[in-house]
Amino acid sequence: KPYSWRSKYGWTAFCGPVGPRGRDSCGKCLRVTNTGTGANTIVRIVDQCSNGGLDLDVGVFNRIDTDGRGYQQGHLIVNYQFVDCGNELDLTKPLLSILDAP
């Protein structure tokens, strides 16, 4: 993919309980919201993981860890929702996951 595609959003690995898995999720976008502060951002799925949630790149983690508690606790609790980023998938029900600190 071109740099403009790769740099539009922060990156995450995805292995959540709902939604496409593996290769089918790659390139899709999520709106990720810190449940403690309401801070949110859009990320693009670029990999898969095995922890049952999301594995955010450090820039994204820091962007939504606005009160520093995620870093202190070693994880964030977030809601995530599939959003349109130029792909056809648009799931509207928010989901819940726990993220480990970078």
Curated annotation (Swiss-Prot):
GO molecular function (one): RNA nuclease activity
Record's note on what induces expression: By wounding.
Coiled coil stretches, renumbered: none
S-S bridge residues: C15-C49, C29-C85
A Pfam entry, by short name: Barwin
GO BP annotations, alphabetical order: defense response to bacterium; defense response to fungus
PROSITE patterns the record matches: BARWIN_1 (PS00771), BARWIN_2 (PS00772), BARWIN_3 (PS51174)
Keyword match Disulfide bond: yes
Record-given protein name: Wound-induced protein
Annotated gene: WIN
